[in-house]
């Protein structure tokens, strides 16, 4: 029985000592992690700015606006015509006298 208690005590001490060593081990340095993170974000921002300066993005934006303009112009004109016709019909209704009730 004493032998079993001694073995259990020895196993417990060894496991606690191992946990203590793990806690004392140097973990990743937080400052270096932040430095790496900010450096990668800076590099990404620089790459993005270089891509934005290229004429490819500008030409794509110009093509998009031209296409949108071509598609919206007829729609706006037809909406304007419909609005004028609607107001004209309202004006014609107001000009007609209502029949008198008998």
UniProtKB/Swiss-Prot annotation:
Signal peptide (residue range): 1-18
GO biological process: cellular response to lipoprotein particle stimulus; cholesterol efflux; cholesterol homeostasis; cholesterol metabolic process; diacylglycerol catabolic process; high-density lipoprotein particle assembly; high-density lipoprotein particle clearance; high-density lipoprotein particle remodeling
GO function terms (MF aspect): apolipoprotein receptor binding; cholesterol binding; cholesterol transfer activity; enzyme binding; heat shock protein binding; high-density lipoprotein particle binding; high-density lipoprotein particle receptor binding; lipase inhibitor activity
GO cellular component: chylomicron; cytosol; extracellular region; extracellular space; spherical high-density lipoprotein particle; very-low-density lipoprotein particle
Listed InterPro entries: ApoA-II, ApoA-II_sf
Compartments, record wording: Secreted
Keywords carried by this UniProt record: Amyloid, Cleavage on pair of basic residues, Disease variant, HDL, Lipid transport, Oxidation, Secreted, Signal, Transport
Annotated tissue distribution: Plasma.
Domain of life of the native organism: Eukaryota
SUPFAM superfamilies the UniProt entry points to: Apolipoprotein A-II
UniProt modified residues of type Methionine sulfoxide: 49
Note: The apo A-II stoichiometry in HDL molecules varies among inbred mice strains, because of structural polymorphisms affecting the apo A-II gene, which influence its translational efficiency. The sequence presented here is that of strain BALB/c and C3H/HeJ.
Sequence similarity: Belongs to the apolipoprotein A2 family.
Oligomer status and interactors: Monomer. Interacts with NAXE and NDRG1.
Record's disease association: Defects in Apoa2 are the cause of senescence accelerated mouse (SAM), the senile amyloid is a mutated apolipoprotein A-II.
PANTHER family linked: APOLIPOPROTEIN A-II
Role of this protein: May stabilize HDL (high density lipoprotein) structure by its association with lipids, and affect the HDL metabolism.
Protein name: Apolipoprotein A-II
Organism field: Mus musculus
Chain's gene name: Apoa2
């Amino acid at each position: 029985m004493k032998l079993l208690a001694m073995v259990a005590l020895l196993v417990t001490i060894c496991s606690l000592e191992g946990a203590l060593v793990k806690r004392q081990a140097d973990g990743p340095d937080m400052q270096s992690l932040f430095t790496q993170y900010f450096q990668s974000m800076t590099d990404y921002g620089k790459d993005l700015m270089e891509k934005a300066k290229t004429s490819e993005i500008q030409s794509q934006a110009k093509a998009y606006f031209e296409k949108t303009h071509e598609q919206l112009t007829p729609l706006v004109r037809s909406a304007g015509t419909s609005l004028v016709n609607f107001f004209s019909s309202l004006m014609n209704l107001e000009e007609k006298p209502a029949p008198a009730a008998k």
